[in-house]
């Protein structure tokens, strides 16, 4: 009997223990709003008691676009089983290959790390039709589940589906869909818990569609949760992938050996200057001409110390690699200041003790050869990860490290000097193997493409480190020859006019590429700086500056509303090479004006090296007041170089420019398609213009736009049925512009250009940017239009005239746009308005040959997602054709415009005002890209004809 009682007691105890270990099951029926009491809810989230599934019970939880619903189960990451039904509607964004996510569902840890499935989009996923599992932190801006994911390959079948996340305390996480393991009959063929960072479950996660199209609504029904005990199983991640860096490079290089110029072999310093030039640099540094740079440098070096956190990454890697490290090193060269020498050595030892130059932050190591050797072995053994040691931060760090090692070469301890030389060489190898040869998983956006700032930036550090640390030895030949091939590829696809399709803000990347070219020319005898691009880049920089040189004539991704000059001091060197005294004077003037600005005050080492004080006598006021940039289809005019001058820019060209686009047919993909070209920073702005006067922007443009994306509604152009310009196969409004699948060179094209002294006429055709398109988000659609011809006429001291000829085969709504910081009506009946900013203002008048419905709205223009709140005239017409004529009055001449049509293909435009009675007779172009015929006249003034014969635009 005692044995029986003892047995019963033992069984009872076991049952109690088992019951306590087993979770209490919780069910949520979503019958009323109290069902989510205690949840963390944001955005479009609601309980719908009437929404259910066939054979289901209770209502459903609705999570609309942007909504979030988190149910925190506790503070610990435990085992447990989570089951629910979701309704899959199959909807997807227009561009499912852009990194984004639609509706998501899953589980999360106590520290906010979520594991989710649902509609996950990326170039390497099929998120529009299949599922993946992704991990991210929903609270961390920029983090996305596509960045760490496992592909399930399961179809997104429309309908209700049961999802189970079973976190077993002994075995880890299993995922089931409709009660079937996502791994099917082959374990771990798709999902492997050990590849995740999810040790247990604390929270249940439901998130709404976050794509631009925001078309998906998530419905959740029948939620059941059973929390279990603490996890016994621990994540056992697979071993890291093997390092991508081979022990040795290939023995033989393709092509001729890279030989160092005799005067440079085994000589230091040799990067950017030699020992023979140091006396000249010192003289300039101590001269009145060098005073600003000297004061900048002396004021800056005090803060040049190794950071306490030992991170290389502040300011995108620029703070140390491009600013502080080279600044203090050059200060030592020029002054022999012992403190600056010690700071420079400390920088080198910091980097010698750091394997990861992308982030840094590694603990300090002993100052011994053995410790540095271990760091070197760590570097060589690093496996693929993101863009570690192959991103811009790593490259910028290589720039500063290479220059400092080279400039201080003769004063460094010989043993440490050799250790650091090896570090530079190995970092160059890692940059090339990890970046250019795809050893790291990320970086596809810049690999293989020409004319892109990210590639130029990487080539900067790669070249200085490889050529600076190398000597042309047999074992170095392969990498040196690869570097030369890389530079040649960049050289081959530079536009001749010195322009950059990414906008004037990216002049720093051209300066970086120029330094790489210059080092190659100096050390190995190439002639890359002989490229027409570098003959013209200084002029381009000046011409894309506003007349006061405190800001740029903005296009593409430029800082909206901010002041700044888009010049790299390296262009002083190229201007000196080509004896461009006026350009040099302009750059010098701008660097003085912006002396205290970020990116200038911290770059004083550059103008000290690159200026040539022997070139004198120039004046920027002698620079041309009208210029045409054929690669981008840009016309720039100004009435002088005075600060309050009137200036205008007209743009009609393909995204990426003609030169980069000409590369695509030469590198077709296996199936015959055109390859990817990075146009991420280009804007949909064909046939747009800006106007400045009285030292202010009057007709404004977009900034460095992010949300709500790159839109034609942010610039001075037109919309068709409310939709702007798109590339073939791409949606409107991407944050990072993507190339069309077909030829982009006909999206925008200059059809005529004529400079006639005080009169400049430029004409562009942009119908190719208004292809047939349906927007998944707004449900708007439009047919392709036949013509969007805009003529932009500059009459110096008088007015600016814009004339549009717009045609479609089907009736459409045409919306004509013009925006400024402030816009107010003067006489709406006459179409007269006033643009204003600060103390500057000018009036304009708009006429058309069809009835207009005009209103003043707010532009979508933004700068880093902050709306600029430009006020925008939106003048709409309906039909198959419309002609608009707009006269802008920046010289305050009180001019007026009249438009008199003569059938569909002819019109007369008159511009009148005190002392002005001009007539412009227009006859439409015959062919797609033929020039229209214009005859303009002013009594006792000009009498000009512009047509296909007299106004052929300069070739790109």
Residue map of PLM features:
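Aromatic-lined, polymer-binding surfaces characteristic
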Residues: 270-278, 282-539, 546
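Extracellular carbohydrate-recognition regions
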Residues: 23-44, 83, 232-239
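Secretory/extracellular carbohydrate-interaction modules
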Residues: 63-133
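Short tryptophan-centered beta-strand motifs in secreted/extracellular beta-sheet-rich domains
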Residues: 159-168, 173-177
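Extracellular glycan-recognition surfaces and repeat-rich motifs
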Residues: 34-60, 67
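Extended polysaccharide-engagement surfaces of secreted carbohydrate-active enzymes
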Residues: 506-956
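Short, aromatic/His-centered strand-loop micro-motif at the edge of beta-sheets
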Residues: 137-162
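Flexible glycan-contacting loops in extracellular carbohydrate-active proteins
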Residues: 186-219
